[in-house]
Amino acid sequence: METKAILKGVRLSDQKGRLVADQIRGKKVDAALNLLQFSPKKGAAIIKRVLESAIANAEHNDGADIDELFVKTIYVEKGPILKRFTARAKGRGDRISKQSCHIYVTVGN
């Protein structure tokens, strides 16, 4: 049995999100939540929210036992880029790229 949770359009770069996702892939959900709770990274709080949603989906929709769940798959894909400009010297402008990503979490036993 597998249950999914998806969060799209997160204002976090995919590279920074993958650093956190790689740490919890394949772990039991209680160990993964504990690791995410004490991680100082911005992506940890966001991924924790998605993981909690996947756990709630498994419990409510499939009647799964939380103690037996583990993170089957987790991946972070590139999302749309917001392009902004900032003023520079002599009338020039530089582009600022604000990255976003999509987070996909699957839990199962």
From Swiss-Prot:
UniProt keyword rRNA-binding present: yes
Highest taxon listed in the record's lineage: Bacteria
GO CC list: cytosolic large ribosomal subunit
GO biological process: translation
GO MF annotations, alphabetized: rRNA binding; structural constituent of ribosome
Oligomeric and partner information: Part of the 50S ribosomal subunit.
Similarity remark: Belongs to the universal ribosomal protein uL22 family.
Function of the protein: This protein binds specifically to 23S rRNA; its binding is stimulated by other ribosomal proteins, e.g. L4, L17, and L20. It is important during the early stages of 50S assembly. It makes multiple contacts with different domains of the 23S rRNA in the assembled 50S subunit and ribosome.
Protein name: Large ribosomal subunit protein uL22
Organism: Herminiimonas arsenicoxydans
